[in-house]
Amino acid sequence: MASTCPKCHRVLEDDSVCCADIKYTWKCRSCGKLSTGFIIPYGRCFLCGGENELNCDYAGPRPDLVAIVQEAVRYEIDMYQFYRFGMERTTDTVLRAVLEELYHKEEDHIAELEEKYHMHLDPGMLDLPEQAGQIVSQWIFQGIDFEQSEGHILEVYDRAIVMERRTCERFRELANVLPPGPHREVYSELAAEEEDHVSILETEREQFLNK
């Protein structure tokens, strides 16, 4: 008999894994706060901004695939939050439009992974509470002064390109360790789309420099 997701009760694909009830626990290296969930954006403590370390790992079925899914979702949500907070901070209309376009692309990627692996993410991981949002945003854009009307634009592009390249390379690595099949296809497609994001950012960066 086919298994079903305990949250949405949809039938699972034979080769898939349901992440609905999977929770990890992290402990902040600085203040000791414990945090529980499927992912924590940027691995930061929402109380003090310190770095979290894994305190309780997943020990259920198919831990190898679950670890790959968890890492992929974390990369996508990290980029999602980068574009979301960048949109809110910048006063440049062109940069905001570029960040908004990529924000929605990352939103689609998260929805695709959610559909396939049934994470049923806590809405607070996407729409962070105010204090958590401030901590994550300050950490993401550390060293970038958004008060400089044009001074911040190049720095935002450069930081986004570095992060997108890192994400693209990691998705390729994940695809390469998976056997042929739908899981490998998912990560190969995500890698290709992240590469497209790099191209968009590089084009906009070049246009900004040449204007």
Predicted features, each with a name:
Residues M1-K211:
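Non-heme di-metal
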